[in-house]
A protein has these predicted regions:
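A long, amphipathic alpha-helix that forms part
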Residues: 12-21, 29, 50-87, 97, ...
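Extracytoplasmic/secreted proteins, especially bacterial periplasmic and envelope-associated proteins
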Residues: 13-17, 21, 55, 59-62, ...
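Secretory-pathway/luminal and periplasmic proteins that interact with or process carbohydrate-rich
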Residues: 96-104, 229-235
Length: 313
């Protein structure tokens, strides 16, 4: 899959090849240059863990292949039972590729497993002394390969830039999807819309109480109108906050980003700059103020901020 001596070249080639493929597919129509700058320019020959890092990406590719095979088995089973055409299949990831480094991890810590299902100890190669591959080794891609995996975007999981929060979704439902079949849509959605979609499809209603207590209304909105007509009245804004990383996206394509508590808001026009290469905050301060005010209102309403122990911004 990958030769360690050539992996730095491969990183550039793979990233560029993915970018060219995205252009061919018309994923970002009307944009001619949406590949963000590489975030790392160090040389592969200076990497003391070159062989380990190359193997980690090879294992990652193999895992994706196994996922693909598993999905194929599900689809074949649905075909055999005659249920495929009337089954809604949604496929997406939960965030961008992770930059986490297993050198900083310990088995049994947080959600990290310390043994396999049959009781074998899992090795966390803090010095990358054991190559990735077997189920008894824990591996990760790290930031450099994540920058490749998240092409064309900047950054990765846990960040509020597109490389962290943009998760394209595939929907398959022959009997239900009536518009733009086999195509793409630029309609904006959120993972919380999935539950709203399921409730809509089931012709059910979201409850207003639980055991005599009022509960908060559902934030998500059904994706069904997009499947049937190609459009819907979606969210006016979508807000994000994770480890003090903040983002706020408007339905007209503007996006605020604040990567730290003490950072200034950054402003991007995703209609023209999908990979967030040009900060327009200084050019459009009124837009920043408008969206920042809306973010504060959203954060308060959804009880995102302030949270216990939160430091002043």
């Amino acid at each position: 899959l990958y030769s360690s001596a050539a992996s730095d070249v491969y990183k550039r080639q793979i990233r560029n090849a993915r970018y060219e493929r995205q252009k061919q597919l018309g994923i970002f129509p009307g944009m001619d240059n949406f590949l963000s700058e590489r975030q790392f320019h160090d040389k592969w020959e200076d990497n003391p863990h070159a062989e380990w890092d190359a193997r980690a990406m090879a294992v990652h590719a193999a895992m994706i292949d196994r996922v693909d095979q598993g999905i194929g088995q599900v689809i074949e089973a649905l075909k055999k039972t005659g249920q495929l055409d009337n089954t809604l299949i949604l496929f997406l990831s939960d965030n961008g590729c992770s930059n986490e480094d297993c050198q900083n991890m310990t088995g049994g810590e947080n959600d990290r497993p310390d043994m396999t299902r049959d009781g074998k100890k899992i090795i966390y190669p803090r010095n990358k002394q054991v190559l990735p591959g077997p189920q008894t080794t824990y591996a990760s891609l790290g930031a450099r390969w994540s920058n490749v995996a998240n092409t064309p975007f900047r950054f990765w999981k846990a960040k509020s830039y597109e490389g962290g929060i943009c998760t394209p979704m595939i929907a398959h439902w022959p009997k239900g999807i009536k518009k733009n079949v086999g195509g793409m849509t630029s309609e904006i959605g959120h993972v919380m819309d999935i539950m709203a979609t399921c409730i809509d499809l089931a012709d059910a209603e979201y409850p207003t109480t639980y055991k005599g207590h009022d509960i908060l209304p559902m934030e998500g909105k059904s994706l069904l109108p997009i499947f049937k007509t190609g459009h819907r009245k979606g969210h006016d804004y979508l807000g994000f906050e994770h480890f003090n990383e903040r983002a706020f996206l408007s339905n007209d394509g503007w996006k605020l980003v604040r990567p730290k508590n003490n950072s200034q808001w950054e402003l991007y026009n995703l209609n023209e700059d999908r990979s967030e290469q040009h900060d327009l905050a200084a050019k459009y301060p009124e837009k920043v103020a408008e969206m920042a005010k809306a973010y504060e209102a959203w954060a308060k309403r959804c009880m995102v901020e302030p949270y216990p122990g939160q430091k002043k911004k």
